[in-house]
Amino acid sequence: MNKIELIELDEFNCGAGHIYSVAVDGADQTLYDLFLEENEGDYRAELGEIAHKLNTMSTWTGFTDIFFKLNEGKPGDGVCAITDLKGKLRLYCIRFGNILLVLGGGGPKSKLIRAYEEDPKLLSENLMIRAVSDAMAKAIREKDLTIEEDGSLSGNEIIELDNQ
C-alpha cells in the first residue's frame, strides 16, 4: 500500500482557493513537479498556459468549470483535467468545489487518440489521481481529513492509497 502526502503549493495560493499536489511514498517531488520536469523540454509554452490558468484561478476566479475538462474519472469523484489552449498537454487534478484543487500528473495527448485510455502514460496518471480521489474521500468520511471553508486542508495530510 502506498502512502501519499498532500502538499500545499504556496506559489499558487493567493486568496481565491488552495492548490495542493501529491507526493507518493515520501518522495521529494510532487506529481505536479514531475509533470513539469517531464514536459519542460517539448511543451514549455503549454506549461506556461497551464501555470497561468492555475494562477488566475487561485488569485481571482476560484476553480470554476470553464478552466477544466470535466468528468475524467468516475461520476462524482471530482477528477478533471486542465489543458493548454490547443489541447496538447493534459494535467489531471481533483476539484473540490471552487476552493480546493489537488494536482496530479499528466502528459501530452496526441491528436491521433480520442481518449486518455488509448495512451499508457495518460491512463496511468489518470488512474493515480482517481486513487488519490478515493483515498481523500475515505479520509474525509472517516474525519481524518477536513476541507476548511477557505479550501485549506486540516487533519492528517498523509493518507494510504488502496490497491496501488
Model feature map: region roles:
Residues K88-I94:
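Short acidic loop-to-beta-strand element that houses the catalytic metal-binding Asp/Glu
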Residues I94-L103:
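Active-site beta-strand-loop-beta-strand hairpin of nuclease catalytic cores
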Residues M1-K88, K111-Q164:
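Basic, Lys/Arg-enriched alpha-helical interface segments
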Residues L100, K109-S110:
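A short acidic, glycine/proline-enriched capping/turn motif at secondary-structure boundaries
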